[in-house]
From Swiss-Prot:
Species of provenance: Mizuhopecten yessoensis (Japanese scallop)
Keyword Repeat included in the entry's annotation: yes
Keywords: Calcium, Metal-binding, Motor protein, Muscle protein, Myosin, Repeat
UniProt cross-references to SMART domains, sorted A to Z: EFh
Protein name: Myosin regulatory light chain A, smooth adductor muscle
Keyword Oxidoreductase: no
Residues recorded with modification Blocked amino end (Ala): A1
GO function term, MF aspect, one: calcium ion binding
Domain EF-hand: 20-55, 89-124
Matches recorded under InterPro entries: EF-hand-dom_pair (IPR011992), EF_Hand_1_Ca_BS (IPR018247), EF_hand_dom (IPR002048), Myosin_RLC (IPR050403)
């Protein structure tokens, strides 16, 4: 019954994630699913952490697995990670954060300016983090369209004019 519930859970997650990200998540899931039964269980996690040189105790591993409301199949794995990837900020909150730097209200910012802010303020992004963040970002003529970007990362697909 639990496995059936896991199969039904959050199938709309497939519509929310870009195809490339979904493929990367599938590869990650397959690497973790050591026994290839289509579900990640405590033994799969033990083997994965062992291969990384870590040995978390069963309590930690059980806590990780409890984030899923049922057995951890690929759909549930995607759902959990898409929630984590999308974070807790709403699309409007993110858009408003970018808008603070958009004095002329053009809905676009100079991409070099944004990169400079991210490299030198707050979390201090590395060059690799920067490349990954802006890999599929809507940038035209050096201008970063933050309205499209926030819609893209939050999965709404809505773009304001």
């Amino acid at each position: 019954a639990d496995k059936e519930r896991a199969q039904r859970a959050t199938s709309n997650v497939f519509a929310r994630l870009p195809q490339k990200l979904m493929q990367e998540m599938k590869e990650a899931f397959t690497m973790i699913d050591q026994n290839r039964d289509g579900f990640i269980d405590i033994n799969d996690l033990k083997e994965m952490f062992s291969s990384l040189g870590r040995t978390p105790d069963d309590k930690e591993l059980t806590a990780m697995l409890k984030e899923a409301p049922g057995p951890l199949n690929f759909t549930m794995f995607l759902s959990i990670f898409s929630d984590k990837l999308s974070g807790t900020d709403t699309e409007e909150t993110l858009r408003n954060a970018f808008a603070m730097f958009d004095e002329l209200d053009t809905k676009k910012l100079n991409i070099e300016y944004i990169k400079d802010l991210l490299e030198n303020m707050g979390d201090n992004f590395t060059k690799d983090e920067m490349r990954m963040t802006f890999k599929e970002a809507p940038v035209t003529g050096g201008k970063f369209d933050y309205v499209k970007f926030t819609a893209m990362i939050k999965g709404s697909g809505e773009e304001e004019a």
